[in-house]
Amino acid sequence: MELYYYEDCEYCPAVFETIAKLKIMDKFTCKDIRLNPYYAKELKDLTGNVTVPCLVNEQGPMKEAKDIRKYLASHFD
């Protein structure tokens, strides 16, 4: 799975806290869209914008932190 984020995002820490709590960090490729402009382009091509956090799994992109956390808890807890 891929997780698009940037460090100053106010919603990203909650997603990272859930990932840490579930001990599943190894399941992600984390892509900071501010450190790597190519990641921002990937995200824009995929979703039409550069809103983060964005989790991409086999079903496609998921954009809301609340939805991402709920998905992670239901699939990895």
Predicted feature residues:
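Structural micro-motif
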Residues: 46-56, 65-66
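Non-catalytic, surface beta->alpha helical segment in thiol-disulfide oxidoreductase systems
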Residues: 57-77
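Local sequence-structure signature of Cys/Sec-based thiol-disulfide redox active-site neighborhoods
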Residues: 1-27
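Thioredoxin-like thiol-disulfide oxidoreductase module
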Residues: 32-49
